[in-house]
Regions:
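Peripheral (often C-terminal) accessory segments that flank ATP-dependent C-N-forming ligase machineries
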Residues: 101-170
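Broad, structure-driven detector of short, well-ordered beta-strand segments within folded domains
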Residues: 2-6, 62, 118-122
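Active-site/pore-lining binding-face segments in mid-to-C-terminal subdomains
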Residues: 65-128
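Glutamate identity and glutamate-enriched acidic tracts
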Residues: 38, 45-48, 63, 76, ...
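A short glycine-rich, hydrophobically flanked beta-strand micro-motif that places a catalytic Asp/Glu
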Residues: 2, 57-69
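ATP-dependent carboxylate/phosphate-activation module, predominantly the ATP-grasp catalytic core
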Residues: 2-55, 78-103
């Protein structure tokens, strides 16, 4: 779950959840899909109770594993902006801006509460080796091109991607 907690944990914005589709060996940020929270069956009351009990305000992500029988096992909660959270912004919900306006200006801006459709996120170079191994070169290129959200690749600002590309070529 990726979200933002306001009003000491009493008001939660959780527009979606991510599911890792391919996990690289060297990180927990893999090729994933962000889906709308309305399609996810989870115990929202436990999440709400935890964040309101600790009185937390801010960005967060909550991670758990679901077994084959549907039982959830808590892994961790990150009380910070998650590395995968950019896909939520790509989907149209800018959680860091909501948090900024709440924390600095004392207001909750109007915002889109949920995402309309799933967004695929690819961590570009981190995923390349495992992605090509699993999908083949053309399969991975297809996933790269069709992913709506990337960790580095952005047509409006190619600098970080080109820098990292040069680093990998050397």
């Amino acid at each position: 779950l990726i979200g933002c907690s306001l009003n000491d944990g009493k008001d939660l914005i959780i527009p979606g959840y991510t599911r890792i589709l391919r996990q690289p060996l060297n990180t927990n940020t893999g090729y994933l899909i962000l889906s709308t929270i309305e399609t996810f069956n989870y115990n929202a009351e436990v999440v709400e109770r935890f964040l309101s009990t600790i009185g937390y305000n801010g960005l967060f992500s909550l991670e758990f594993i679901r077994d084959k029988k549907g039982k959830d096992y808590f892994l961790e909660i990150n009380l910070r902006n998650d590395g995968n959270a950019y896909c939520v912004q790509t989907a149209g919900v800018n959680l860091p801006l909501i948090w900024f306006k709440y924390a600095i200006l004392g207001e909750v801006p109007e915002f889109k509460e949920s995402i309309n459709k799933p967004v695929f996120f690819i961590p570009d170079f981190i995923d390349m080796k495992s992605g090509i191994k699993k999908e083949g070169l053309f399969g991975w290129i297809y996933q790269f091109v069709t992913a709506k959200s990337h960790s580095l690749f952005n047509l409006r600002d190619m600098g970080p991607f080109i820098y990292e590309l040069k680093r990998h070529i050397r």
